[in-house]
Swiss-Prot record:
It comes from Lacticaseibacillus rhamnosus. It is an enzyme of class 6 (ligase). PROSITE patterns: GATASE_TYPE_1, GMPS_ATP_PPASE. HAMAP family: GMP_synthase. It catalyses: XMP + L-glutamine + ATP + H2O = GMP + L-glutamate + AMP + diphosphate + 2 H(+). The keyword ATP-binding applies. It holds the Pfam family GATase. Catalyzes the synthesis of GMP from XMP. GO terms for cellular component: cytosol. The active site is at residues 88, 176, 178. Residues 11-202 form the Glutamine amidotransferase type-1 domain. This is GMP synthase [glutamine-hydrolyzing].
């Protein structure tokens, strides 16, 4: 959504200082019904004034305010009379620029910490317990608050864990209120948004649909749009939204690249072409993708190859059509942040944003690139899509190509397909499909000795990844009952050829990402 489409909404903007959590802050604010968007830290006071936000949040970041070339702020922003909340690095930056002191911590803090609220009148902590558990992630700390500020919370390793200047409506927290690990993070952000900023909850998905359709129609005019369908939730929702906006001007290409889940190609054609009437061209490009991936083991190279091949297929198919000017993609907000911004450290490139060539022949339309996964599901249901389609398991653009660790071969793909199908069957059979946010199998490329029947085997290991999450930015491993896991393991080793061992991934995000590659 462009800014001019959001003038009717109260909004709180988040300045980007490079934290991988910064998109989470915008998500939390949107959960209150307040529109929020990330802005570069280089934004000027004049630009902020034009946006007219109800509040500003300085995000965290990986650097020190004393680093050479440290990320700063237009100090005139402090003079606008707009409430500001500094989070982690954002608090340190606020303290330094307003005359306080910031120094390296004797002990870096990463993880849970206990704080004590020292001033019961502090607005951020109104009606909250004195003792709280929060999530810290910092190497520096504020050692002296600026004039006009007071300390409002403290901890053993961080004596100034929170501060405020109520008169100027400046607030700082050294911890991350946006992550689920902070006990009262939701309430703290709620206090800032409503009690400090006095923002009104007037942003909704219904409004998003109305304005996004108007935007698409204005941008596309009478031209034609090409959409790449992957079979996942994101591209399917884009297809239905575009079809609602421009009807027959949309042509969808479904590339069967040989990296899909079992039965997925048939399901895509039946659901979107049969039930929604989308014009879909199916392209069998399996041999092309597998040939280009032969011998490639580096995950970044695999992603780039898959992204490149997608675009090349689109170019070739578009050349057969007349009047195609736009390419639509199902890029999400999380795709953008994990691929890195000017200030964020790149974790991994995403298929939707990392594989595009400089000579792209189309103008891009990415109607979901400001939405999180749970918002996309809400959008799909608002558009009348069936629950079963909207709540399908998330599936990465590169497909099973990044669930086979190392070189991708047809034999390895079959192992992942068959094991993943068993996992999905068992999860559904035990009624866990609504509780587990995402679950899939992965082939790590590890072979080990086993015994099957009376003989020795030397076969592959299958990894199971099952996580709980709200928006994909942070995640925890799902606590699946041991008996269910045993049943899944037994079926996989008995029904999937060349597998003699099953392991369960019990790593959270962070430090791991959801996908293995």
């Amino acid at each position: 959504m462009a800014n001019d489409q959001n003038k009717d909404y109260d909004k709180i903007i988040v300045l980007d200082y490079g934290s991988q959590y910064n998109q989470l802050i915008t998500r939390r604010i949107r959960e209150f019904g307040i529109y929020s968007e990330l802005k570069p830290h280089t934004i000027t006071a004049a630009e902020v004034k034009k946006i007219a936000p109800k509040g500003i949040i300085f995000s965290g970041g990986p650097n020190s305010v004393y680093d050479e070339g440290a990320l700063g702020v237009d100090e005139d922003i402090f003079k606008l009379g707009i409430p500001i909340l500094g989070v982690c690095y954002g608090m340190q930056l606020m303290a330094q620029r307003l005359g306080g002191d910031v120094e390296p911590a004797d002990n870096r803090e990463y993880g849970k910490a206990d704080i004590e609220v020292t001033d019961a009148s502090a607005k951020l902590f109104h009606d909250l317990p004195k003792d709280q558990t929060v999530w810290m992630s910092h190497g520096d700390l504020v050692t002296r608050v600026p004039d006009g500020f007071r300390t409002t919370a403290t901890s053993v390793n961080c004596p100034i864990s929170a501060m405020d200047d109520d008169d100027r409506k400046f607030y700082g927290i050294q911890f991350h209120a946006e992550v689920q690990n902070t006990q009262y993070g939701h309430e703290i952000l709620h206090h800032f948004a409503f009690d400090v900023c006095h923002a009104e909850a007037n942003w909704s998905m219904d409004d998003f649909i109305t304005k996004q359709i108007a935007k698409i129609r204005a941008e596309v005019g009478d031209k034609r749009v090409l959409l790449g369908l992957s079979g996942g939730v994101d591209s399917s929702v884009v297809g239905v939204l575009l079809h609602k906006a421009i009807g027959t001007q949309l042509t969808s290409i479904f590339v069967d690249h040989g990296l899909l889940r079992k039965g997925e190609a048939e399901q895509v054609m039946d659901s979107l072409k049969g039930k929604f009437g989308l014009n879909i061209i199916k392209v069998n490009a399996k041999d092309r993708f597998l040939n280009d991936l032969r011998g490639v083991t580096d995950p970044e190279k695999k992603r780039k190859i898959i992204g490149r091949d997608f675009i090349e297929v689109f170019n070739e198919e578009a050349a057969k059509l007349n009047g195609i000017e736009f390419l639509a993609q199902g890029t999400l907000y999380t795709d953008v942040v994990e691929s890195g911004t000017d200030t964020a450290q790149t974790i991994k490139s995403h298929h939707n944003v990392g594989g595009l060539p400089e000579d792209l022949k189309f103008k891009l339309i990415e109607p979901l690139n400001k939405l999180f996964k749970d918002e996309v599901r809400e959008l799909g249901e608002k558009l009348g899509m069936p629950h079963s389609l909207v709540w399908r398991q998330p599936f990465p653009g590169p497909g099973l190509g990044i669930r086979v660790i190392g070189e991708v071969t047809e034999d390895k793909l079959e192992i992942v397909r068959d094991s993943d199908y068993i996992l999905r069957e068992e999860i559904a059979k035990h009624g866990l499909d609504k509780d587990i946010w995402q679950y899939f199998t992965v082939l790590p490329g590890i072979r080990s000795v086993g015994v099957m029947g009376d003989g020795r085997t030397y076969d592959y290991t299958i990894g199971i990844r099952a996580i709980t999450s709200i928006d994909g930015m942070t995640a925890d491993f799902a606590r699946i009952d041991w008996d269910v896991l045993q049943e899944i393991s037994s079926r996989i080793v008995n029904e999937v050829k060349h597998v003699n061992r099953v392991v369960y991934d019990i790593t959270s995000k962070p430090p791991a990402t959801i996908e293995w590659e």
